[in-house]
Amino acid sequence: MIHGYANSGRKNNRMNQEITNILKAYEKALNTSDTRAALALYGSGPVFMPQFSVALSGRDAVRAAYDKIFQTITLNVIFTIHEIVEMGDLAYVRTSSAGETKIHATNKMVRESNNELFIFRKEQGQWKIHRYLFASTNPPATA
């Protein structure tokens, strides 16, 4: 369930709804640990920049990253859209997400909270995730 919405760029309700729908599908893919569904939302040359990792370029690297993530954790998060800005065939979206993460190795539930930046690009008339970066808003764990 996506919350919130603000548009500080050029007004284009169709684009905003298309991108909002992609983010809803992405949220669902994360919450169902569905690599195939997540990857379907990415374009032909994606770059995924998860926290504490090098940038992962290309569909094979992004697929492998999601497979590894979903083997390690199960997410239960809700995204909030703060801003969508269109610039021709590119758009950027600033979001935050919050919820819980189950860590498979320990079977522990921990709080999940992130800021995200998505860059979308139109490919064959469809918006696709082109670049994606996230960083936790939780304080670092103390020893």
Label each residue range with its predicted role.
Residues 5, 9-37, 47-143:
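A beta-strand edge to alpha-helix "cap/lid" segment located at domain peripheries
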